[in-house]
Amino acid sequence: GEIACRIIATCRRLGIATVAVYSDADRHARHVRLADEAVHIGPAPAAQSYLRGEVILAAARRSGANAIHPGYGFLSENAGFARACSQAGITFIGPPVAAIEAMGSKSAAKALMGAAGVPLTPGYHGDNQDPAFLQAQADAIGYPVLIKASAGGGGKGMRRVDSPEAFADALASCCREAANAFGNDHVLVEKYVLSPRHIEIQVFADNHGNVVHLFERDCSVQRRHQKVLEEAPAPGMSAERRAAMGAAAVEAARAVGYAGAGTVEFIAAPDGAFYFMEMNTRLQVEHPVTEMVTGIDLVAEQLRIASGQKLSIKQSDVVLTGHAIECRINAEDPDNNFMPSPGQITFLHEPSGPRVRFDSGVTAGLSIEPYYDSMIAKL
């Protein structure tokens, strides 16, 4: 609901009518109240509602919607859904289907980026999945290595391996987790960069050949391979490194014929080197920090591009001003290993004031349901 509320805010400012979709669990959700219209799409479990593309398309047709903004999560990076929107004559506010497909596989994405001259972490990104072969690749790369699910994300399907003796068990475990989480046990093996920083570049491209970057976000503060704090600009980033990473991200976007908002994620090593990790083909959770330091409404640019217009900005227009830090607020129980903690919100005071932004999908009195991600707000 948080991202739906965010999108509705820009649509309201631009005079665009909005239609919310909601499950049984979200019947009283904030985004349902904010939208001009709301359509019920099914039971609480996501597989029976928010992941059912045909039901969402039916809701769009019934309400007369011209476009669908997928937000993040659920169907936001689903090429099949983007294709179905196109076939139904409804604009998918996101990149072309081919770009989603190209970036959907980490192995295929790395091959494409390598061909475009974007720096890659030393490793094996090919199709041979024989355990003995992968072990030999790891031995040649040198430990520690990282085994990663090719179709992975959200911290699932990743194992750090520090010695040859531990490789076989880690590989088997990683493949099992990947198969269960993504239905695909294909993995890649890469050098594990010690003391790395997770730095990502926000890019935008239109359908007229224009590509710009909106500088970087540092997302190194994580737990369980998931981001907790994000900030822009990255502390200690030199102008030379910023320019090099920005240029590499723009090349990455051009290499896949990108259009819309995208994020190119890099691993940055202490020695100044940086390596392509993946490209997220959607609006990121942490996009507000970029908006705070550039003054650019990312959702508004998405809507411009989706309607066939050119970007409203050139690279020379993008200027960094100040510093922003975002903290994700999750409904979790710290006394129970930070497990998700559903329940009713009895009191909520939203912080406000100069240079303070609070993005939320909840209000006092609402119940946090157990069916979806535990993140409820961002400060």
Predicted regions and their residues:
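Polar, glycine-rich mid-to-C-terminal structural blocks
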Residues: 244, 296-303, 308, 323
